Amino acid sequence: MTTLESLDMPEMTEVEDDTVDIHIDNSKVALLFSKSKVFVHPTSKMKDNISGYLSLSKSKALGNSSVAGSDILLSWVPDSFLKNRPRDLSVFQNAETLSNGSIREWVEIPQHLDYSFSVRLCSIYSIIFRPPRYGWNYGSIVINLRDSGESLPPLFFHDDECISTIEYGKQITRDRFDPFDESGNMFWGGTHLLMQLKKYASLEQSSHESQLYLVNPSPEDTVAFQSVELQKVISNNRLNSSSTPPTPRSSSSIFNPFRRALHDLSFTVLERFSRVTNYGKSEVDRLMEHKVTKSILPHLPRELQVLLESKRVQKLTEEYDPARMFLARWAEGIVEQSESNNSQPVNNAGVWTDAQREEDSSLGPFELVYIEERVKRDDPLSVEQWNSMFNAHGKLQVDVHRVLGIIFHGGIQPSLRKEVWPFLLSVYPWDSTSEERRVIYLSLQEEYCTLKRKWYEDIHKQFNDRWFIEQRNRIEKDVHRTDRQHEYFQIEDLPHPDPQSTFTGTNMNMEMMKDILLTYNEYDTELGYVQGMSDLLAPIYVTFNDNALTFWGMVGLMKRLHFNFLRDQSGMHRQLDTLRLLIEFMDPELFAHLEKTDSSNLFCFFRMLLIYFKREFDWEVLLKLWDVLFTNYLSYDYHIFVAYAIAERHREVLLNQTSAFDEVLKYFNELSGKLALEPTLICAEQCFYQFKNKLALIDRKQMEETNSDEDGSKETDLPTIAPYLRNLLKTSQPQYTPSGKQE
């Protein structure tokens, strides 16, 4: 009988891209534990998911055998590899059934397969265990390697398909009369793996982040991991400093498994430490020489090591505020590019605990548990999908909410917008047939022509009505400076029809835009034309390429944005107040900083909200954003969450690199045309669900207090939720008075 000791020994090899494997004779190892239905999610599409087996196996230790886990391999093998190896597949299945390590049989571990890996436990620095939420979202793990600082592809446990997890969970419930694990989570595949790992390695759970475990930590790792000493140093520095730099919420962390070193808790320490450029030179030197800093530095990317050790960089950032701003913008650019390229894998795999777990503000010292909804971006609605949703009479035969969900999560193919936007802008009813829409179009076309004739054929009005002349001049001026880089408006190939105009040239598209806006001025006699409307009209005009349809699309959009253009600015005040309340409710630290910099009026968001981010995103990207906003899928005022997401994605720069109103305003203005849409939308959706869950938690605690307070004498510490905030959960238009106040 062959013993484990007689097995040929593997040599570890790192493979580029997504594969880390081992080289051993015949690639044979002895299997100890196996878990099926563990998936890699290469993209956001379910069809691309790759199923496989996660396993623990035995090999001979390399080097010092006293190191725990040096002879144990953690591996992932795709099902496709085992499909043509029935004997190996049987071993994996048997190991999963027993899952107690009593059967140890040789199996083959593949080499150079995409996403497959096999690493020694002693080579793993930490593992993030992210449990499922609501009982349906997949739990996942992220494995962070010790020497390279790399993270392996995130692994997702499809527990609803895994027989061993289902059966073991039932067994635990029977034995303990409790379906939860030690951390209070429902039993899931990651819990099963954790139980097995503890047999072969020392795992230390973070006191700051319960989902993070160090594997065989050294004393230096433990010190850096807990970060207590470094926190004391930073606290002392603050006491000795004349100006206290802002710090992030203690539990705020974003783990991105595709960025080197950012995933380790040591980077959380570094993130605190990186603000030393705000301290004096003595504090910088003191931190650089601290033993905790020295223990972390070797694990960081080379670029960061050079940056932190550079006295020239430290001196430059101490002497020149613009240098701090430049470095901050550079860092933001790196993050922006990374998230733009890897938005879905990053956000599916990371740990997003963007709010305090212990809230000590007006909510009282109770635990806030945010339930993470699955957030993903998908492919845009295609022509084929759209056509398949209608019957032979051209009537929608699927649920409208389903259609809106597809658009919300992926947008619309550009060639299809002309057909879909009329539904989103309430030009056509969702339950209409093709024939009914044809009749509606003809009726709307006639109504548009009638409205246009009211001013177009009134010569007296054109030359003597002072109000009309003023409005026409405003429209003329605005149209001639709207989107002049777009091909529709770029070339002036016609002489201006009015010889008295200050503009000598024009083109047909600009003239049609003027006509539509003058007709809208006739349609909405109360509001008329207000500067900024030309910015809103241009995308609709280019998309529809039909004057009547464009006009009624503009009417639909203005029903949504009417209050933005009121003379008393009450609508804009309401929106900015809502955004202000949202920031204060969700991120008190950021709100306090905005107050400190005299920026809590949020004037930096005025343009974004006024014209629906028209100047913040490039043309094609803007249209995709409008696809999302027009759906009202999660909220009628979802643009408030988009604005909040922009603030959150840039919060660290705002907190650490801005100190006055003009700096905040300048920073936001310079974001124009540089924002990445997909990460912003993912962040906005996460923020929405966090807001919704926090609101529900407060309401639940309010109800509990009310039920327990029979005589009504007990005062509550819970915050009062403003109506503006509650309106953010509505998917239909909230009712406001003409002054913009809520009825």
Swiss-Prot record:
Residues 411-633 form the Rab-GAP TBC domain. It is found in: Cytoplasm; Nucleus. Keywords: Cytoplasm, GTPase activation, Nucleus. PROSITE patterns: TBC_RABGAP (PS50086). InterPro entries: Rab-GAP-TBC_dom, Rab-GAP_TBC_sf, SGSM1/2_RBD. This is GTPase-activating protein gyp7. Its main location: cytoplasm. GO terms for cellular component: cytosol; nucleus. It comes from Schizosaccharomyces pombe (strain 972 / ATCC 24843) (Fission yeast). GO terms for molecular function: GTPase activator activity. The keyword Nuclease does not apply. One of its GO terms (biological process) is vesicle-mediated transport. SMART domains: TBC (SM00164). Pfam families: PH_RBD, RabGAP-TBC. Most effectively accelerates the intrinsic GTPase activity of ypt7.
